[in-house]
UniProtKB/Swiss-Prot annotation:
The lineage of its organism: Archaea, Methanobacteriati, Methanobacteriota, Thermococci, Thermococcales. This is PCNA-inhibitor. Binds to the DNA polymerase sliding clamp (PCNA) and dissociates the PCNA trimeric ring, leading to the inhibition of PCNA-dependent activities. In vitro, inhibits the PCNA-dependent activities of DNA polymerase PolB and of flap endonuclease 1 (FEN-1). A motif (PIP motif) lies at residues 31-38. InterPro entries: PCNA-interact_regulator (IPR053615). It comes from Thermococcus kodakarensis (strain ATCC BAA-918 / JCM 12380 / KOD1).
Length: 64
């Protein structure tokens, strides 16, 4: 541990500059409408309750 700071910096490898393609980001999912998944009865039921789609997703649907 008698090394000086300059010796540590000198041993470091320089960053490589790559000319490869940039990393592609994951595509985001398009927002979907719950109308295409739920029956009309359930859609009307939740609209009457005036609750958001997150609560609709987590709700347990019981017999009307």
């Amino acid at each position: 541990m008698d090394r000086k700071l300059d010796e540590f910096i000198g041993d470091a490898t320089p960053k490589k500059v790559s000319k490869e393609k940039p990393v592609r980001r994951k595509k985001r999912l398009k927002p979907t409408s719950l109308d295409s998944f739920l029956p009309e009865e359930h859609i009307n039921y939740f609209r009457d309750l005036r609750i958001g789609s997150k609560k609709i997703r987590n709700a347990k649907i019981e017999e009307l």
